Amino acid sequence: LLGGVATLNQINQNIFKLEACKWGTKTPFASIRRIVRHTKGIYRIKPGLYALESHRQELEGNGIIVQNEENQDSEIVKTFNHAYYQGLLLEMGKMRHLDTFVPDQDKNKQFLNQSLLGDLRTIQEIPNYSYPQLVKRSSTIDVIWFNERQMPHSFFEVEHSTDIQNSLLKFNDLQDFSARMVIVADEKRHHEFIHKMKYAAFSKLMEDKRVAFLSYESLDKQYTQELEKQQFEFVI
């Protein structure tokens, strides 16, 4: 594994570079997933994210730790989760052949042990897709996907502990764009999201169902499903 830790996507990409690695199956991804789940010496940090036991101490020292009830509200987990899910969204956008952007304020944050978020984004500057004040307003959104015309396809705000209302205010200012708007957070914050969406200031967002809530668990699952789709020559 790269640096002792890797997503299933990274494992999938790198394992075929090994000359001695031969697969007698048409579904190698499923085999890889089964192997990492059941091989001694490999442990799961999150769904779709695995590490070597021999690197556990080093990884934990770098803030890459298994979340539990005791540490879930710690700063180290907050920092790790925010950068990790930004990284997943950047990878998923690229798999869907979209351009991806992460703000400059986050570009030097580490995604696992190998990459910076700035290295994962496909464009280094946000496109001038509209009036300067609107482009500037969107430039701090955690992850943006752009279509082939350099127009916003999806806005994502990752909310581990910060106030969801701040993200909704951004979305409110950008509601005239035909782009998906998504709050990514722990499922336990879903009720808070619904409560904030009912504020009068966001009545238009609520009425038009402009903002979706995506739980970490759902994102993890969709990331894995997106990887599985990559093995097919044609996807319906």
Region annotations inferred by a language model:
Residues 1-9, 13-14, 18:
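Positively charged, polyanion-binding regions of nucleic-acid-associated proteins
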Residues 7, 100-103, 183-184:
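A structural signal for short, well-ordered beta-strand segments and their strand-loop junctions
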Residues 9, 18-68:
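Charged low-complexity interaction tracts in eukaryotic proteins
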Residues 28, 85-86, 139, 167:
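Amphipathic coiled-coil/heptad-repeat helices and related helical stalk/stem segments
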Residues 32, 63-105:
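Nuclease catalytic cores
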Residues 73-78, 94, 102-150, 223-233:
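Active-site metal-binding core of divalent-cation-utilizing nuclease and nuclease-like domains
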Residues 121, 127-141, 147-215:
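Catalytic cores of nucleic-acid endonucleases
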Residues 208-236:
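C-terminal helix of von Willebrand factor
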